[in-house]
Each structure stands twice: as structure tokens, then as C-alpha cells.
């Protein structure tokens, strides 16, 4: 039996490797493993809770330098007076707002989910939108 979905996932994983984006490649390979093993029974949970769990992990990673003391309070306070930091804050707010609209769009217009997901993966892979630290 020819599995088109598996072929698409393999292609996207290859794109992740070709673009040296291990975040995309590893994420898709994990999903492939889930798909081809008995773990596939977890897909409903992954689909329902995966985004929330991912955002929690992302937030932990972003906040870790503050919690560990690596980012001193003086640097954090300075970010509110430096123009580059203020621009970074504004961009962060805008990106968060866009992300929220994308999640709402996915819920309200499910027919757009496939295009939005493929576009996100391609954007990350080709334009290095999210990269793991080396």
C-alpha cells in the first residue's frame, strides 16, 4: 500500500535536512515514527495538545536565562531603554499577535490548515525561521 502522507512527511523531513534545519527534520521524523508504530494511537492527543505543549516548552526555553540568572536583571531593565531592544520587543509582540491569528484561523477555517501548516514548515526550512542553537 502506497502511503502518500508518509511520502509528503519524508519530503518535508528531507527539506529540513537539506536546509540544515534540524528542528524541522527531527520534528517530522518523530511524527513519522509515531505514524508507523503503535504510538499512532496518540495522534488525537498530539493534535489537541501538541501546540500547547510546544508553546510551553518554547516559553520555558526563552525564560530560562532569566530564571537561571544568566540574564541579569540589569540587562532586562536596560532592554526597555535601548532602541534596538524596544524594536525587538515590538517585533516579538507583533509575531505573537500573528501567531495567535494563525491559531484562530486554523480553528475557524479548517480548510486552510493544510496550506498554513505546509507554509509554516517550508518557511522554517527555507528561510530558517526557527533554528536550533548549535
Swiss-Prot record:
| Cleavable signal peptide | none
Q: Name one Pfam family in it.
A: DUF441
Membrane topology per the record? Multi-pass membrane protein
Recorded coiled-coil stretches: none
Give a GO cellular-component term: plasma membrane
The family this protein is said to belong to = Belongs to the UPF0756 family.
Protein name, entry field? UPF0756 membrane protein YeaL
Q: Which organism is it from?
A: Salmonella typhimurium (strain LT2 / SGSC1412 / ATCC 700720)
What is the gene called?
Answer: yeaL
